[in-house]
Amino acid sequence: MSSLVRPINLGKINHSQSTVKDYILLMKPRVISLVIFTGFVGMWLAPYSVHPFIAGIAVVCIALGAGSAGAINMWYDRDIDSLMKRTQKRPIVRGVIESDEALSFGLITGFFAVFFMALCVNLLASFLLLFTIFYYICIYTIWLKRRSIQNIVIGGVSGALPPVIGYAAVSNTISLESIILFLIIFIWTPPHSWALALFCNDDYKNCKVPMMPAVKGTLYTKKQILIYSILLFIVSLMPFFIGMNNFIYLIIAGILGVVFLYYAGSLFYDTSDNKQAKRFFAYSIFYLFFIFLLLYSTNTISTIS
């Protein structure tokens, strides 16, 4: 398939307009906040202890790694970002950061994140961080996003790895516990992203990104959201059954999951505008945050010492 990148004129760059805030926005701070939180929970649940200073370095490296991937993603997607309403205010599109500077910033930030993770934490965590950055940029952004309807499903691997990295930073291992953390985010990502695609469908059609609603239609997408929501409900209860979290987790996670299924079912039967998709999208963010907060607060394994 030919490239969907379109030549665009972003206008004259005014370097005096660039601020620290612009570079923070370049790193996708909302994504970073979730990455930091899930990565920290992964560290907390590891059945070993680590010095808080080392844990802090690991968290910073995870954040910088995510930020570097976000910056390079914005560099590569600058053409379609200029066509989508929700991304038209990104720094490169606004012309406050030059595209080459964004690429350099992302590469340098990623290098130091991986380097210091290896130097100060351990090689496994460093390798997983490097793999996550590579996967998000090369597999998702460059290869899948503009070519496959399964872009979110396959590409979701990178977004689900932060708790695995955090767990490995403390334990220097990959275990069943960290795999379950991975699966929770991995299965959560498609319904969350497809709900967004439902109410941003015109944007994705305009820039020819093959999101599921644009290719398969609304009803098919809603069916997939419901299927993944059922799978998520099942996987979200696994931490209790392997002894990672206590009975309180089972009860509250079960309630949160039932509400998630309610929103998915309501979305499936909804024939009106996109209000229900927006409600589901908003709840999905709350759901993931609260599930990981529960994983943190009801664990039965250990804590960082």
UniProtKB/Swiss-Prot annotation:
InterPro entries found in the cross-reference section: Protohaem_IX_farnesylTrfase, UbiA_prenyltransferase, UbiA_prenylTrfase_CS, UbiA_sf
Membrane topology reported for the UniProt record: Multi-pass membrane protein
GO terms under cellular component: plasma membrane
Any single biological process term in GO: heme O biosynthetic process
Cell location: Cell inner membrane
EC number(s) given by UniProt: 2.5.1.141
Pathway given in the UniProt record: Porphyrin-containing compound metabolism; heme O biosynthesis; heme O from protoheme: step 1/1
Record has Isomerase as a keyword: no
GO molecular function: protoheme IX farnesyltransferase activity
UniProt superkingdom: Bacteria
Chief subcellular location: membrane
PROSITE patterns: UBIA
Functional description taken from the UniProt entry: Converts heme B (protoheme IX) to heme O by substitution of the vinyl group on carbon 2 of heme B porphyrin ring with a hydroxyethyl farnesyl side group.
Similarity-based family: Belongs to the UbiA prenyltransferase family. Protoheme IX farnesyltransferase subfamily.
PANTHER family xref list: 4-HYDROXYBENZOATE SOLANESYLTRANSFERASE, PROTOHEME IX FARNESYLTRANSFERASE, MITOCHONDRIAL
Additional comment: Carbon 2 of the heme B porphyrin ring is defined according to the Fischer nomenclature.
Listed name of the protein: Protoheme IX farnesyltransferase
Upper taxonomic lineage: Bacteria, Pseudomonadati, Pseudomonadota, Alphaproteobacteria, Rickettsiales
Gene responsible for this protein: ctaB
